[in-house]
A protein has these predicted regions:
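A short beta-strand-turn-helix
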Residues: 47-64
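Structural alpha/beta surface segment adjacent to cysteine/selenocysteine redox centers
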Residues: 62, 70-154
Length: 221
């Protein structure tokens, strides 16, 4: 009886610790967004020197493509960007084995739409992933005013080579509208109902859904 009770206590303690860690990560994002200057995503250093084409990260001729569906206000996307993406980039993208295409969605609200448009507009300058990482690193509370044209200008100004004025002018550009429509269509076709979601397959071929839990083994396979 004592052994069983100890097991229950240990399991409860582990669950509580996991909840505390997750809450700490999510709360910390809102606090960073209120700081004086933009924080830096761990992924930012990882993507340095890797080719970007619009919303794609990695060599165009990489044999495999990972479609990543994300919302700039999704806290779990931000956690994935911070904890999982750097390792994937280092192991698969930088060596030229994988290309990641961001499929932006705006599930959460109007600030999701504004932030996504900014990422796509930055992508017209091949800086989309740099801005995406920066937004995740400075993610605030959902639709609480952390994403405005003013804050986006500040974020953009901290990225070398990104023209903030041009980015803001392109928020409603035809290319941005086209990318928005393409991502919505791809998400609908793939049955995507939440973020982050993933599809993996040969570059130029059909991509298949893969769960976040299975992504690591699928990439290694």
């Amino acid at each position: 009886m004592r052994v069983n009770l100890l097991g229950v206590v240990v399991a409860a303690a582990a669950a509580l610790a996991g909840a505390v860690i997750a809450a700490s990560l999510l709360t910390g994002r809102g606090q960073r967004a209120a700081s004086d200057g933009p924080g830096v995503s761990p992924a930012a250093a990882e993507i340095g020197g890797i080719p970007q084409q619009g919303i794609a990260l990695g060599a165009p001729d990489a044999p495999r493509t990972l479609a990543y569906y994300g919302d700039v206000q999704c806290p779990y996307c931000a956690i994935w960007d911070e904890s999982d993406l750097p390792g994937i980039v280092d192991e698969y993208v930088r060596p030229g084995e994988l290309r990641i295409v961001f499929r932006g969605l705006a599930f959460i609200g109007p600030e999701s739409d504004l932030g996504l448009r900014a990422v796509l507009a930055a992508g017209l300058q091949d800086q989309g992933w740099n801005l995406l990482n920066l937004l995740y690193a400075n993610q605030g509370h959902e639709n609480a005013g952390w994403l405005t044209e003013s804050s986006l200008r500040r974020f953009a100004a901290s990225i070398p080579g990104l023209d903030a004025d041009r980015m803001l002018a392109d928020l409603n550009a035809a290319e941005v509208e086209s990318e928005l429509a393409d991502s919505r269509a791809a998400a609908q076709a793939g049955g995507v109902e939440g973020t982050p979601s993933f599809e993996l397959g040969p570059t130029g071929g059909a991509l298949s859904p893969v769960s976040q839990e299975e992504l690591e083994s699928a990439l290694a396979g």
